[in-house]
């Protein structure tokens, strides 16, 4: 795996400014993977038909979702120069829509393949030109290049619109937003480029709110927030594992669903039912941990709930 993808760097301040630019975007509800739910693990509950479309074709259909304008322009990046493009090595990898049953008792960190399989059903969004090269942004202060991967498609669309307004040449190059599986992030290999995930601003706010409830008062959140609950444990084929959500709302709906399935009349959440973690830290723990702390984690794509009913494939 490319160690240049997730670790913190000196460019964190620039990323924080990017996140701040998106903080005023209005929240918009969307089921990002509705058209590919039939290809996902049966634990996911989304209403759909019996078709099983190719995951890339289905993800690409989300490009037509509504665009929103930035309230503040991203002024920290050069607008006088043509955008930098970088080709990403595929290494033969493809998008796979599935959730892997946890591997227990290995006594060491999970393999790259095992981690990639758990992320295969989670989409991220990037800016690309007609040659399938991804746009890089350069900070005026550092001069270094960043490849941005967005957790929310609308955020990628608004950045594309902003960059096109600053440099009309991008329109001639066929620049667009493309979707790829988060597992593909681990295959990105571009020398001298650091790839960073940009979280949804609403989920950053949710994470800060939950941390404040837990007694942690902080105005900043570094990384992509993910949400889990000790009250939600899934079981499949005599194994138990913990679902981790990229959206707090999906976790809350899953907790309510679990309460209903367990015939609890009052599914109201108690303080402390929701815990916040950093996605990048979990992935690092999966790679490096010598214990089984992370081998029961399953990542749930945005827009999906989970069922506590035992499921067998």
From Swiss-Prot:
InterPro entries from the UniProt entry: Tic22-like (IPR007378)
Span of chain positions assigned to the transit peptide in the UniProt entry: 1-96
Subcellular location: Plastid, Chloroplast intermembrane space
PANTHER family: PROTEIN TIC 22, CHLOROPLASTIC, PROTEIN TIC 22-LIKE, CHLOROPLASTIC
Function description: Involved in protein precursor import into chloroplasts.
GO cellular component, one term: chloroplast intermembrane space
One Pfam family this sequence matches: Tic22
Keywords: Chloroplast, Membrane, Plastid, Protein transport, Transit peptide, Transport
Keyword Transit peptide: yes
Primary location group: plastid
Family: Belongs to the Tic22 family.
Membrane topology type: Peripheral membrane protein
Name of the protein this chain belongs to: Protein TIC 22-like, chloroplastic
GO BP annotations listed: protein transport
């Amino acid at each position: 795996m490319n160690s240049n993808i997730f670790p913190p760097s000196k460019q964190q301040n620039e990323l924080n400014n990017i996140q701040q630019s998106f903080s005023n975007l209005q929240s918009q509800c969307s089921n990002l993977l509705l058209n590919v739910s039939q290809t996902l693990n049966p634990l996911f509950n989304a209403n759909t038909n019996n078709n099983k479309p190719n995951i890339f074709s289905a993800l690409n259909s989300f490009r037509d979702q509504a665009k929103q304008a930035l309230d503040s322009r991203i002024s920290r990046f050069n607008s006088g120069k043509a955008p930098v493009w970088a080709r990403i090595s595929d290494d033969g990898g493809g998008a796979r829509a599935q959730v892997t049953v946890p591997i227990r008792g290995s006594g060491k960190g999970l393999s790259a393949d095992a981690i990639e399989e758990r992320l295969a059903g989670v989409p991220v969004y990037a800016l690309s030109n007609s040659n399938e090269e991804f746009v890089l942004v350069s900070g005026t202060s550092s001069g270094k290049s960043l490849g941005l991967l967005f957790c929310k498609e609308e955020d990628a669309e608004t950045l594309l619109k902003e960059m096109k307004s600053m440099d009309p040449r991008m329109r001639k190059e066929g620049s667009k937003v493309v979707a790829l599986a988060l597992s593909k992030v681990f295959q990105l290999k571009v020398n001298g480029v650091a790839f960073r995930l940009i979280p949804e601003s609403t989920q950053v706010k949710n994470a800060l709110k939950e941390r404040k409830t837990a007694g942690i008062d902080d105005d900043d959140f570094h990384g992509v927030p993910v949400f889990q609950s000790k009250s939600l444990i899934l079981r499949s084929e005599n194994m138990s594992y913990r679902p981790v959500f990229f959206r707090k709302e999906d976790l809350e709906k899953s907790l309510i669903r679990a309460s209903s399935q367990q015939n609890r009349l009052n599914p109201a959440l108690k303080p402390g039912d929701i815990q916040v973690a950093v996605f990048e830290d979990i992935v690092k723990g999966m790679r490096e941990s010598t214990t089984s702390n992370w081998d029961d984690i399953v990542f749930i794509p945005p827009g999906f709930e989970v069922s506590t009913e035992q499921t067998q494939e």
